[in-house]
Amino acid sequence: MAAAAATLRGAMVGPRGAGLPGARARGLLCGARPGQLPLRTPQAVSLSSKSGLSRGRKVILSALGMLAAGGAGLAVALHSAVSASDLELHPPSYPWSHRGLLSSLDHTSIRRGFQVYKQVCSSCHSMDYVAYRHLVGVCYTEDEAKALAEEVEVQDGPNEDGEMFMRPGKLSDYFPKPYPNPEAARAANNGALPPDLSYIVRARHGGEDYVFSLLTGYCEPPTGVSLREGLYFNPYFPGQAIGMAPPIYNEVLEFDDGTPATMSQVAKDVCTFLRWAAEPEHDHRKRMGLKMLLMMGLLLPLVYAMKRHKWSVLKSRKLAYRPPK
């Protein structure tokens, strides 16, 4: 009996260094087939492991990465050197009163800005997308806007005889153009075409900061910079040479409300007016945003309560699979 037990133990354990007979014996005792046993041979181990990159490849990849980074830096440096003559001064960010999340436009400033446009800017620049009716309720009453429109003569027609005629302006009329066509505008401004100011704030990078800096940034050209006749130096304008003469200066006009017409005040008011012209829905958009935030503050707790109590049954429901018998 003892000899039989020793023989069985030797078959299960096997000799030292030969694990396969012992494993085969264990598999046979447990009811497993011999083909299901894993073979721990050197070939199987080498196939199951993942070899990394060699040292030479790592060095090559590191060198390529350093060359790519150096080439990118050199390209940026050369581009900056080539475009140094085209460098323009970026406008600073000014603390406009309407830039707050809940801040509205200054409507008294809009009224003064329209006065600046009417007396200073309208001689060269048009505003094709702004009508006199747009001023009603913003900076003028309806009667005041009608009086402003009647100051200009608008071509209309034809009449019963088929001829065009001139009539006083109406609220539905748009601001008059200073020139009949672009060719006439270029001929009167030494070949430069004055841009339309309806959306100039939205059309320029920097918005009203750029327009304010451009209006107040005229200065004498630095030493070594020469400009041809009819051009003026402005560091905020691309190329620094602009064909528009300095349009504003201290006491360039008198405001109706008695505000001192300093250069910065005039530039601020006309920039505010141009911001309103480019975005007349500015105040309405912020009011709607505030109302939406208030409504969402009331609706979100209700939605959360509905989700928490109405859908908790479905969320905690468990499905049990019962196989067919």
From Swiss-Prot:
Catalytic reaction annotation? a quinol + 2 Fe(III)-[cytochrome c](out) = a quinone + 2 Fe(II)-[cytochrome c](out) + 2 H(+)(out)
Q: Which note does the record give on the cofactor? A: Binds 1 heme c group covalently per subunit.
- Taxonomically, the superkingdom here is Eukaryota
Q: Looking at the keywords, is Zinc-finger present?
A: no
> Cytochrome c domain: from which residue to which, for each copy?
108-209
Give the residue spans that cross the bilayer. Answer: 282-315
Q: Which UniProt keywords apply?
A: Electron transport, Heme, Iron, Membrane, Metal-binding, Mitochondrion, Mitochondrion inner membrane, Respiratory chain, Transit peptide, Translocase, Transmembrane, Transmembrane helix, Transport
Under InterPro entries, the record lists:
Cyt_c-like_dom (IPR009056), Cyt_c-like_dom_sf (IPR036909), Cyt_c1 (IPR002326), Cyt_c1_TM_anchor_C (IPR021157)
In Pfam terms, one family for this protein is: Cytochrom_C1
What does the entry list under GO cellular component? mitochondrial inner membrane; mitochondrion; respiratory chain complex III
- Kindly give the membrane topology term recorded for this protein: Single-pass membrane protein
Positions of heme c binding:
C121, C124, H125, M244
The entry describes its oligomerization and partners as: Component of the ubiquinol-cytochrome c oxidoreductase (cytochrome b-c1 complex, complex III, CIII), a multisubunit enzyme composed of 11 subunits. The complex is composed of 3 respiratory subunits cytochrome b, cytochrome c1 and Rieske protein UQCRFS1, 2 core protein subunits UQCRC1/QCR1 and UQCRC2/QCR2, and 6 low-molecular weight protein subunits UQCRH/QCR6, UQCRB/QCR7, UQCRQ/QCR8, UQCR10/QCR9, UQCR11/QCR10 and subunit 9, the cleavage product of Rieske protein UQCRFS1.
Entry function: Component of the ubiquinol-cytochrome c oxidoreductase, a multisubunit transmembrane complex that is part of the mitochondrial electron transport chain which drives oxidative phosphorylation.
UniProt family annotation: Belongs to the cytochrome c family.
Q: What is this protein called?
A: Cytochrome c1, heme protein, mitochondrial
Q: Which organism is it from?
A: Bos taurus (Bovine)
